[in-house]
Amino acid sequence: MTDTTRSLRDCLAPAKLNLFLHITGRRPDGYHALQSVFQLLDWGDRLHFTLRDDGKVSRVTDVPGVPEESDLVVRAASLLKAHAGATLGVDIEIDKRLPMGAGLGGGSSDAATTLLALNRLWRLDLPRTTLQSLAVKLGADVPFFVFGKNAFAEGIGEALQAVELPARWFLVVTPRVHVPTAAIFSEKSLTRDSKPITITDFLAQCGIDAGWPDSFGRNDMQPVVTSKYAEVAKVVEWFYNLTPARMTGSGASVFAAFKSKADAEAAQAKLPAGWNSAVAESMSEHPLFAFAS
C-alpha cells in the first residue's frame, strides 16, 4: 500500500470465509439469527483513493453489473462524508479480483476498506465503533471487515468477538454460478433451528492450539445450495475424497484448509481444467486495522 497526503493506493479489501455457519432462529424483524466464525484471507480486491477538493465522491472505474450510485464503495464514502461533515471528496478506483456472488464478502469488504481508508485520508479520526455503526447500514458483513479481526459472529453478523485462529492456507474454488443470498434464506427447506453454541465450544476444537475448522459444525445453507446448483454440488463432491471442504456464506465458493502453501497448491493442481480457483493465506488482522482506534 502507498500512503501519501493526497492518495492511498493498493488498499487490500480482503476476502472472508465462514468456517462454519449455523442458523439458530428467525428474529422478530424477519432477519435470520446466525452464528459463524469469520476468517480473513490475504486475497481480495485492490482499491485506490485520491482526494478531490470539490467535495465529490466518484467511482472512476467501471464495475460490470454494478451502477455507480448503487455501488457499496460509493454509498460507504457518501455515508461517511455526510456523518462527519467532510468537505473533501474522493476518486475511487477498484481493481476487482474476487468473484461476485461467491460468499467471499467482496462488496462488503470493499465498503469497509473505503470507510477505513477515508477515515485516514480525510483525517476524520473516527473511532472504530463509529465506523462499525455506519457499516451496519451498508450490509450485514461490512461491520466484520471494519472490526478487522477474525471473529466469532452472532445476531445478523454484527455481534463480534475476536478469536485467534491457527495460521493456514486455503484452496478456494468458485463455480461459475451466482447464488442469490435472499433466495436461499427464503427456502422452506433451510435449517433454521440449529442449537446455539458458545465461543468456548468452537475454540476448544478449532482455536489456535487446537484443530482445523472443518472439524467443527457445518454450513446450514450448503444442503439447500447444492440441491439447487449442480455446479456447487460438483465441487463439494470433487473435494470429498481428497480433504474435508465446506461452502462459505451462501456460496458459491467452496474451500478447504491446508497446513502449507505447497499442500494447497498440490490440491489445486489436481482440479479439473477450467475450474476457477485461488490459493490464499489466512490473515489475523485487516491490513487497514490501524486506520481506526
UniProtKB/Swiss-Prot annotation:
Pathway: Isoprenoid biosynthesis; isopentenyl diphosphate biosynthesis via DXP pathway; isopentenyl diphosphate from 1-deoxy-D-xylulose 5-phosphate: step 3/6. It catalyses: 4-CDP-2-C-methyl-D-erythritol + ATP = 4-CDP-2-C-methyl-D-erythritol 2-phosphate + ADP + H(+). It is an enzyme of class 2 (transferase). The keyword Disulfide bond does not apply. Its EC number is 2.7.1.148. It holds the Pfam family GHMP_kinases_C. The keyword Nucleotide-binding applies. ATP binds at residues 99-109. GO terms for biological process: isopentenyl diphosphate biosynthetic process, methylerythritol 4-phosphate pathway; terpenoid biosynthetic process. GO terms for molecular function: 4-(cytidine 5'-diphospho)-2-C-methyl-D-erythritol kinase activity; ATP binding. InterPro entries: GHMP_kinase_C_dom (IPR013750), GHMP_kinase_C_sf (IPR036554), GHMP_kinase_N_dom (IPR006204), IspE (IPR004424), Ribosomal_Su5_D2-typ_SF (IPR020568), Ribsml_uS5_D2-typ_fold_subgr (IPR014721). Keywords: ATP-binding, Isoprene biosynthesis, Kinase, Nucleotide-binding, Transferase. It comes from the Bacteria. The active site is at residues 16, 141. Disulfide bonds: none annotated. Belongs to the GHMP kinase family. IspE subfamily. PANTHER family: 4-DIPHOSPHOCYTIDYL-2-C-METHYL-D-ERYTHRITOL KINASE, CHLOROPLASTIC (PTHR43527:SF2). Catalyzes the phosphorylation of the position 2 hydroxy group of 4-diphosphocytidyl-2C-methyl-D-erythritol. NCBIfam families: ispE, PRK14608.1. This is 4-diphosphocytidyl-2-C-methyl-D-erythritol kinase. It comes from Burkholderia pseudomallei (strain 668).
